[in-house]
Amino acid sequence: TPVSDAEPEERNIIRFVKNSTELSYNFTIRAASPTITSISNTLPAAGEKVTVYGTGLEETSKVTLPGSIEITTGIESDEDGEWYSFTMPSGVTTGGSIYSEGANGQAATPAYFNNADCMILNFDGSGTQGFWSWSETGSMINADDLVTDPVSGSNRGKCLQLIPERLIAAGGIMSGKPRASECWTAGNDDAADDWSRMYQYIPKETPLTEVALQFDIYVAENEPWSNCGHIQINLFNNFNFAGIGSDDDGSSNQVAFYVPYIQDGEIVPFYTEGWQTVTIPFSEFNKYATLIADKETPTFEDVVTDRNSASYRNFGIGFVNTDFTYKDVTVESNTFATHIYLDNWRVVPCKDIIISDYPEDEEETE
């Protein structure tokens, strides 16, 4: 009988019964150590639900947040061990890992929970938005295009509506359009755009498999994203938001793409329950993925150097509405007018932490 299916008083005991004689031997039986794969929302507001996904997480009974804040009540966990959830308490002021205890032992998340140390742009005063050549019908997003957090009770202040309301009101983004919308940081003259400021939190020698871009996304259930379009992320301002399959998508380019509605070879309507965190390791940006495939080990210093040596070091995220093929799925563009909201662009450590069944073997691993 699996440990989690047995009654608590019957677990971890071997009983030998013969005639009127009985011998019990106590020891611990459990599955492999639990692992963590993702967190639904790594920058939650107090009162928001947080779900941690992984394996072996059944019967999670204790959660410890950064700052040694313990939660022992109100925890829900999946009977198959694929997740546990809790409500974010007030008073969590530091970032780091979440530690949990359950039927199969301890688990820990990467140290990116509640971690805003390396914020790029949050649209509320941390980081500086840049914009130029703005027009009513143009792709450039300025400060007036920002909107108030649309999620009830979240109170995040301002956020980015990726397709500005002025473009939706005009009929949406036409099919076949690259550079449909774009949002940038201020660039060369802004100290926040020199990412060497982040070395105090993420050492320059950190491999890019252990450093990630995170941002939060909200797409309402009654208006899912599924028919077309994708997000392009530019490490600096030297690309055209031409999208997947274009010259921007070269193997030596510092770009990445996000297409959440393509899952396991199929198109699945994408929406979120409140704000959801997206984590993209820098090892998945084209240039660095190519280096890793060639058995090299790019580091965070390479990212900073590439940005600081660029003519324009603005960091940018934009929407592209062209035809493309991604993970063997071909998407044909249509008119697009879905509301997609982004917030809290940031750089975070993403090294996995594995807690062994044997304390002397405990280690962190990629």
List where the protein language model places each region.
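Ser/Thr/Pro-rich low-complexity tracts
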Residues: T1-E136, T148-V151, G157-R166
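Extracellular Ig-like/FN3 beta-sandwich strand-entry sites
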Residues: E7-R11, T93-G95, L208-E210, W275, ...
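Extracellular polysaccharide-targeting segments
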Residues: Y112-L121, T322-E366
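Extra-cytoplasmic beta-strand recognition segments
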Residues: F123-G125, Y199-G229, I280, W345
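Extracellular/lumenal carbohydrate-interaction signature centered on repeated Trp-anchored short motifs
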Residues: A186-L213, V268-E273, V304-S311
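Extracellular beta-strand ligand-recognition surfaces/modules
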Residues: Q214-F215, Q232-F236, T277-H339, W345
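Extracellular ligand-binding interfaces
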Residues: D216-I292
